[in-house]
A protein has these predicted regions:
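Extracytoplasmic/secreted envelope proteins and their assembly/folding machinery
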Residues: 71-74, 88, 98, 184, ...
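Long hydrophobic segments that form regular secondary structure
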Residues: 298-318
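Terminal intrinsically disordered/low-complexity segments used for targeting and assembly
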Residues: 2-79, 135, 155, 159, ...
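Small/polar (Gly/Ser/Thr/Ala-rich) solvent-exposed segments
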Residues: 85, 105-131, 142-171, 190-193, ...
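Hydrophobic, lipid-facing positions within transmembrane beta-strands of outer-membrane proteins
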Residues: 133-141, 183, 285
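Acidic, Gly/Ser/Thr-rich repeat motifs that build Ca2+-stabilized beta-propeller blades
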Residues: 94-101
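Periplasmic alpha-helical coiled-coil/stalk elements that build and connect Gram-negative outer-membrane
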Residues: 151, 167-285
């Protein structure tokens, strides 16, 4: 009997060791750059423009504009934007899938219980006649041996999916921030053009007044006054399209902030200074710039997940091995179950 138990234990330990070392399917390796492509592209090595800096780009890159109002708008959009909240919810869901996959690699337990009521008659033996209640309780334990690595590949696929969703979240975050900066810049640029156009209209009105006065004095002809009026009308006609452009930018900004289109910050109507970066733009080296792109990271992680699923599909061709056991008890009282 001892020999049989020892043999069973040996088989169990061996199976566990094999399960920890074996996984069918291809092992994922990140795609390598072609041999002729260096770590830093030639364009970045040869570029010596003072407009760029090899320093890494900060996470809050919009602060390079040194505009407190813009900083507040971006931070507000990152908190309330609907697309960003959807991406965050998807990321939490994928992380929950990873936790579930990892939980399957451990011991699974289950508890069950029940109660039954029966009536017996007095036949002179056993229990006396009457109604009796019976309580049942049991515990079950099971463990799946990951002999061919199916659980391992499942965890790898789930983790890669979560990483891809994290990259998608970063992409959504960058997109929201960039759209806010773009809408804010468009609104301020339109405001600056409106200020210039309005000033031009005022100057032309003064010029027309002088022309009409000179015409009455005989210094100018009626044709000169007509030309001045036509130029004034042309300048006045250029203002409404600029105002429409500013309103469109402000409406877009309001939507990015999770507001109704007309509920944009009122102070933006007075913005006439276009935000600019007054320092060298930090971009890092070429390799860092590529690694920073979330769409590239998302594609690479999607490839890793697809590779892991090849292993899952291969593992499904093999039988699965699980060890299990259960223990139960029956009593007529709760105290008797313990």
């Amino acid at each position: 009997m001892r020999a049989i138990r020892f043999h069973a234990l040996t088989v169990l330990v061996s199976a566990s060791l094999v399960a920890g070392c074996t996984a069918v399917g291809p092992e994922y390796r990140a795609p390598a750059l072609p041999a002729h492509v260096g770590e830093t592209p030639t364009g970045f090595k040869e570029g010596r423009s003072p407009a760029y800096s090899p320093a890494p780009l900060p996470a809050h890159w919009w602060q390079l504009y040194a505009d407190p109002q813009l900083d507040e708008l971006v931070e507000e959009a990152l908190k309330v934007n609907t697309d960003l909240r959807v991406a965050a919810a998807n990321l939490e869901r994928m992380r929950a899938v990873v936790n579930e996959a990892r939980a399957r690699a451990g011991v699974e337990t289950s508890l069950d219980g029940g109660a039954s009521v029966g009536e017996t008659s007095n036949l002179g033996i056993g229990s006396p006649a009457g109604t009796h209640a019976t309580l049942d309780a049991g515990i079950g334990i099971s463990y799946e041996l990951d002999v061919v690595g199916r659980i391992r590949r499942t965890i790898e696929a789930a983790q890669a999916d979560a990483d891809a969703q994290a990259a998608a979240y970063d992409l959504a975050r960058i997109t929201v921030a960039a759209n806010v900066v773009g809408a804010y810049s468009d609104a301020c640029a339109a405001g600056a053009r409106i200020a210039v156009a309005t000033r031009s209209v005022d100057l032309q009105r003064q010029s027309l007044a002088l022309t009409e006065r000179g015409m009455r004095a005989g210094l100018y002809t009626p044709l000169d006054a007509t030309r001045s009026r036509a130029l004034l009308a042309q300048l006045e006609a250029a203002v409404p399209p600029l105002e429409s452009s500013r309103k469109a930018a402000l409406y877009s900004l309001a939507v990015l902030l999770g507001r109704a289109p007309g509920d944009y910050p009122a102070q933006l109507d007075e913005c006439t200074v276009i935000p600019t970066v007054r320092q060298s733009l930090p971009i890092g080296d070429g390799a860092a710039l590529i690694r920073r792109r979330p769409d590239i990271r998302e594609a690479e992680r999607a490839l890793a997940a697809a590779t892991a699923r090849v292993g899952i599909a291969t593992a499904d061709l093999y039988p699965s091995v699980s060890l299990g056991g259960s223990l139960g008890t029956t009593s007529r009282s709760v105290e008797g179950l313990v």
